[in-house]
Regions:
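Single conserved hydrophobic/aromatic residue that forms the stacking wall/gate
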Residues: 1-11
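Solvent-exposed alpha-helices and their adjacent loops that cap or buttress functional pockets
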Residues: 3, 61-63, 119-122
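Structural signature of PLP-dependent enzymes
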Residues: 13-35, 62-66
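Short, well-ordered beta-strand elements within core beta-sheets of diverse protein domains
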Residues: 13-20, 67-75, 127-132
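Short acidic amphipathic segments
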Residues: 36-45
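Conserved PLP-binding catalytic core of the aspartate aminotransferase-like
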Residues: 44-107
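PLP-dependent enzyme catalytic core of the Aspartate aminotransferase-like
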Residues: 75-76, 87, 102-151
Length: 151
C-alpha cells in the first residue's frame, strides 16, 4: 500500500509494471473465458470472444482485452448462484479493474436497473468477475469447484 508521503514514488513504481500486469490479466481472462464458454447455462459477456455481441466493435477499436467479464447464469435457484460466488476460494468479493487479485460479485437486479444493454432473461443472474494475476489453472479449478453449487 502507498502512504501519502511516498505516493509519487509508489505511483511511478506501479506504472512501470502496468503493461506487464494488464497483459497477464488479459492472458488469464482468455483462458478462463475459454473454460467458461463450455457451459450451456452460462452466457459469457466478454467482447474478446468471437461469439460476443460486441466482438466486431471490440476488434475495430481495441488491441487487447482486460480481466473483466460478466456471466449470465441461467438458474431458477438464486441461492445457488449466491452459493457459487461465496464458494470461490481464490476470489475476493467486490469491484475492481486492474487489481492483482481475482474478485467476484453477484449483481442484483436493483444494481442493474434499467440498463438497456444488460437485460436479464427470466431466471438469469449476473455475476461479475475480475480475473487477477493468480495462476490461471488455479483460477479455473476454483471456478470449477464452485460451479458444482449451481442448480
Amino acid at each position: 500500500s502507498c502512504s501519502l508521503v511516498g505516493s509519487e514514488m509508489c505511483i511511478r513504481d506501479r506504472l512501470r509494471t502496468l503493461d506487464v500486469r494488464l497483459d497477464k490479466h488479459q492472458d488469464n481472462a482468455k483462458k478462463v473465458a475459454a473454460f467458461l464458454s463450455k457451459y450451456k447455462n452460462i452466457k459469457l459477456l466478454y467482447p474478446y470472444k468471437k461469439n460476443s455481441q460486441n466482438f466486431k466493435m471490440w476488434k475495430k477499436y481495441y488491441s487487447g482485452s482486460s480481466g473483466l467479464m460478466g456471466l449470465k447464469i441461467k438458474s431458477k435457484n438464486k441461492k445457488s448462484v449466491t452459493k457459487f460466488v461465496n464458494s470461490l476460494k481464490l476470489f475476493g468479493y467486490g469491484y475492481s479493474w486492474g487489481g492483482f487479485e481475482s474478485l467476484a460479485l453477484h449483481q442484483s437486479n436493483l444494481e442493474i436497473g434499467k440498463r438497456n444493454y444488460l437485460k436479464l432473461e427470466k431466471d438469469e443472474h449476473l455475476v461479475r468477475l475480475h480475473i487477477g494475476l493468480e495462476d490461471p489453472k488455479d483460477i479455473i479449478n476454483d471456478i470449477k469447484q464452485a460451479l458444482k453449487h449451481l442448480k
